[in-house]
Regions:
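Generic structural signal for well-ordered alpha-helices
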Residues: 11, 33-37, 57-60, 89-96, ...
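Glycine-rich phosphate-binding active-site loops on the catalytic face of alpha/beta enzymes
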Residues: 23-31, 71-82, 123-142
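Glycine/Thr-rich beta-alpha phosphate-binding loop at enzyme active sites
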Residues: 53, 61-93, 97-100, 140-141
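N-terminal active-site wall of soluble small-molecule enzyme domains
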Residues: 1-39
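C-terminal alpha-helical cap/extension of soluble enzyme domains
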Residues: 103-147
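Alpha-helix-loop-beta-strand connector modules within alpha/beta enzyme cores
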Residues: 39-48, 88-110, 145-147
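Hydrophobic faces of well-ordered beta-strands that scaffold small-molecule active sites
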Residues: 2, 21-25, 47-51, 70-75, ...
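Catalytic cores of alpha/beta
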Residues: 8-17, 55-66, 108-126
Length: 147
């Protein structure tokens, strides 16, 4: 997940690495998204777009035939430990409608913990950070998420 406004130079630097499957760029970047997604595919990676909480989901539409995954940010990106944004489940539902006939995975990142995990149960991947890493008992926190 490249949290950078101009990710192409980073992609060029990692293009020969073999242990990377997906490259995620933000929909809100300064560079031409289509060109970057084409480069990602050209280098043999799967392409993924991250979308911030307040970005119009319809901006994803032009890229739905080329991307393999959408990362829905459930907090404003950039700072760990933020609370889960309560409108996120509605955004997930709306994005699921957009991709209903597509083979695109959905991922969420931000504010995921034992209280919010059930609100995102309809996605393929949930990224959990601070809830686990700030705990004195990370194994218990992981188990709490699996219930």
């Amino acid at each position: 997940h490249l949290m950078h406004g101009r990710p192409l130079s980073y992609i060029e630097q990692i293009k020969d690495l073999k242990n990377i499957e997906y490259i995620t760029i933000h929909l809100e970047i300064e560079e031409n998204i289509q060109n970057i997604l084409n480069k990602i595919k050209e280098y043999g990676f799967k392409g993924s777009l991250a979308i911030k909480p307040n970005t119009d989901i319809n901006l994803l539409v032009p890229y739905l035939d080329i991307i393999d995954r959408i990362l829905i940010m459930t907090v404003e990106p950039g700072l760990g430990g933020q609370p889960f944004l309560e409108n996120s489940p509605n955004r997930i539902k709306e994005i699921k409608k957009l991709i209903k006939d597509k083979n695109i995975e959905l991922e969420v990142d931000g504010g995921i913990n034992n209280q919010t995990i059930n609100k995102v149960k309809d996605v393929d991947i949930s990224v959990v950070g601070s809830y686990i890493t700030t705990s004195d008992n990370p194994a218990q926190r992981i188990n709490d998420l699996l219930v």
